[in-house]
């Protein structure tokens, strides 16, 4: 049985080094899809690069934890900036859901303005769209707009609560991450998905060249290792041997 594999590189638009890494991993590797931060400092550079790489599917990386929002968000920003304190607000059940709904719509419209088309799918920076309070907002929005959504089904209590017309891959993995990045780890992710009987899988990745912005990230040099693995010719062959076809959210 042929299975669909979506290799999605997060953080398009974060920095020039990140952008170049994603393009390299698409052009000479197995990355088929990326998601863009429309408030990223290098988003214009990402748009420019994407014009020369039409095979790269581009979704939207919804941002609520970094940089400046596109709308006024007094309930989520500090000194006008987003940050990781969103976790505390979520634990206290104090998230400004109306502000988040408006920001999602604004980032979506900004994406269309930048790239000239709808995103292939939605996901989010630091997986905040999987917060129980935020997920229904994003799922409803994606279904209404007719675009797919990254879904990590482990935190979900009931798949039956999803909108009937919402598209996603059957499986999602964030396991290709950390200090032990290797080809063996990537293939283990595929084998685990196969054992679960999933016919489609998204694997998250973050290939990049290191620049000053990436150097400031807690997740820095493993991005280079990811790039090496994802552009390995042997990995592409091993994926095909396991019965996977590379694709994007256009295919779900």
Swiss-Prot record:
GO terms for biological process: chitin catabolic process; diacetylchitobiose catabolic process; polysaccharide catabolic process. InterPro entries: COD_ChbG_bac (IPR022948), Glyco_hydro/deAcase_b/a-brl (IPR011330), YdjC-like (IPR006879). Its cofactor is Mg(2+). SUPFAM superfamilies: Glycoside hydrolase/deacetylase. CDD domains: YdjC_EF3048_like. Gene3D superfamilies: Glycoside hydrolase/deacetylase. The keyword Transmembrane helix does not apply. Keywords: Carbohydrate metabolism, Chitin degradation, Cytoplasm, Hydrolase, Magnesium, Metal-binding, Polysaccharide degradation. Belongs to the YdjC deacetylase family. ChbG subfamily. Involved in the degradation of chitin. ChbG is essential for growth on the acetylated chitooligosaccharides chitobiose and chitotriose but is dispensable for growth on cellobiose and chitosan dimer, the deacetylated form of chitobiose. Deacetylation of chitobiose-6-P and chitotriose-6-P is necessary for both the activation of the chb promoter by the regulatory protein ChbR and the hydrolysis of phosphorylated beta-glucosides by the phospho-beta-glucosidase ChbF. This is Chitooligosaccharide deacetylase. The gene is chbG.
């Amino acid at each position: 049985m042929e299975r669909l594999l979506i290799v999605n590189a997060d953080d398009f638009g974060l920095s020039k080094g990140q952008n170049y890494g994603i393009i390299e991993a698409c052009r000479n590797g197995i990355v088929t899809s990326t998601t863009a931060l429309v408030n990223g400092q290098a988003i214009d550079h990402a748009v420019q690069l994407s014009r020369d790489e039409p095979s790269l599917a581009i979704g939207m990386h919804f941002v609520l934890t970094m940089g400046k929002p596109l709308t006024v968000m007094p309930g989520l920003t500090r000194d006008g900036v987003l940050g990781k304190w969103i976790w505390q607000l979520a634990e206290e059940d104090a998230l400004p859901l109306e502000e988040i709904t408006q920001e999602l719509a604004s980032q979506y419209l900004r994406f269309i303005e930048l790239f000239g088309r709808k995103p292939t799918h939605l996901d989010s920076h630091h997986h905040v769209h999987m917060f129980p309070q935020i997920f229904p907002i994003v799922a409803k929005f994606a279904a209404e707009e007719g675009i797919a959504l990254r879904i990590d089904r482990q935190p979900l209590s009931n798949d039956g609560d999803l909108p009937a017309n919402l598209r996603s891959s059957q499986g999602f993995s964030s396991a290709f991450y950390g200090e032990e990045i290797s080809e063996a780890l990537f293939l283990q992710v595929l084998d685990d998905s196969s054992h679960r009987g999933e016919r489609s899988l998204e694997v998250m990745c973050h290939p990049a060249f290191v620049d000053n912005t990436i150097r400031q990230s807690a997740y820095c040099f493993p991005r280079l290792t990811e790039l090496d693995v994802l552009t390995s010719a042997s990995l592409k062959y091993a994926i095909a041997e396991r019965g996977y076809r590379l694709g994007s959210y256009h295919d779900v």
